[in-house]
Amino acid sequence: MKRRDFCKGLAVTLAAGTLAPAAALPQAGAATALVGRAVPDDYYTLWYRSDRCGADLRHDYYYSDSLFDHPATEYDNQLALATLGMAAAADCPWESDQRYWMEGEVGRADHIRDAFAKLGFTEVQLFNYTHSLNDTPDTVGCAIARKTLVRGGRQVTIIGAFLRGSGYGAEWSGNLHAGPGSAHVGFVTAARQLVEKIRGYVQTSAKRQPLGTLKLWMGGYSRGGGVANLVAARLPAVLPQLEKKNTFVYTFAAPASLTAADCPDLQQDYDNNHAADGSLKNSED
């Protein structure tokens, strides 16, 4: 869909050792207790892996539900930074690398679970986080959660979906699966799978309770960013209640996945694609 060119923030967050010393992750019980609880000045501490330091570090990001009150076609620097924090949290923690080869729940999603809890998102679902990192499928790890609230007297549901772009082991090999044509098979395959997962999540949530106005908050870095662009372009077609003005997508260091002639169902125009200075971009380049 649209690549949010915000590498300045990426450099700030992913630079190793410059933000905070490594520390132990909070216990699951403590994270759960924080759901929906405001913190002073609306700055929340989110965790991320630092490959350079070989440790899990943390950084404070501003978040408020009011970030989604304006149309997605308006660039928001604070929302871009918050998305960066969530995209980094979607990566597998450094500590989980000790169980690199194991299947199942081994802590690969601890950072993003903690981040969702702190920001008040519930009903977390994880996709492709339980594979051994020795596996090489054309998939992408994604964590999804939702937050239903009242804004301006109307019910609103924010769907948060953040794609893993680092610490994903042999899943990286999908970056090299370019395929015989100009559409990148490794990205397109992962995107089509994820579109169905997110659609199913939204439909199931809607059966539990009315969602009101649906808003999507999505982000990803590197491979995760490339796939997020494609997913976000497709979702409004399979979720008619999701309007473009409510599709908030920021990606970082996202590779190009298609040419203009490829996969029309994964294409989108770029009149809400902005550079880091807020200027409008006219193409994905």
Which stretches of residues belong to each language-model region?
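N-terminal export signals
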Residues: D5-A28
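C-terminal segment of N-terminal export signals and the immediately downstream linker at the start
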Residues: P21-Y43
